[in-house]
Amino acid sequence: MAKPLPRIGSRKNRHMGSRKNVRRIPKGVIHVQASFNNTIVTVTDVRGRVISWSSAGTCGFKGTKRGTPFAAQTAAGNAIRTVVDQGMQRAEVMIKGPGLGRDAALRAIRRSGILLSFIRDVTPMPHNGCRPPKKRRV
C-alpha cells in the first residue's frame, strides 16, 4: 500500500519548507525601470544577484494606474523595505526609462535611509540605429 503524502502545511514538517536565504548585504544596486505603463524596482547585490524586487502591478495597481508616480513610490518602498531589514546601508541607483515613476521612485529610495553612493541614468539611447515606429494618430 502506498504511503500517504505529508501535508504541506502540517505541523510536523514546518522546518522542511523552502525558506528564503537571509544574508547580510551591506552594499547593493537598486535598478529602477520606469516605462509609461509600469515601474519595476529590483534590488541586487554588487555581483548582480537579485535580492528583492517589486513592481506597480504586484503592489495591486491595475491598468493605467500602474504608470502613475504614486504606484512607483509604493513599488520602490516595497522593494527596499525587505533589504533594509537585511541590513543594507549603501546602494547605487540605476534608473532606466522615460516613465513618470522615475522621480517618485528616487524620492522613495532617498526617504528609506539608505546612503546613495551615486545615481546613474542608464536609459538606452540609439546612435541612430533602428527606424522608430510611426507616430500615433489619435
From Swiss-Prot:
Provide one Gene Ontology cellular component: chloroplast
Q: Which domain of life is it from?
A: Eukaryota
Localisation per UniProt entry: Plastid, Chloroplast
Give the InterPro entries listed for this entry: Ribosomal_uS11, Ribosomal_uS11_bac-type, Ribosomal_uS11_CS, Ribosomal_uS11_sf
- Cross-referenced PANTHER family: 40S RIBOSOMAL PROTEIN S14/30S RIBOSOMAL PROTEIN S11
How does this chain assemble?
Answer: Part of the 30S ribosomal subunit.
Record's protein name: Small ribosomal subunit protein uS11c
- Origin species, per record, is Morus indica (Mulberry)
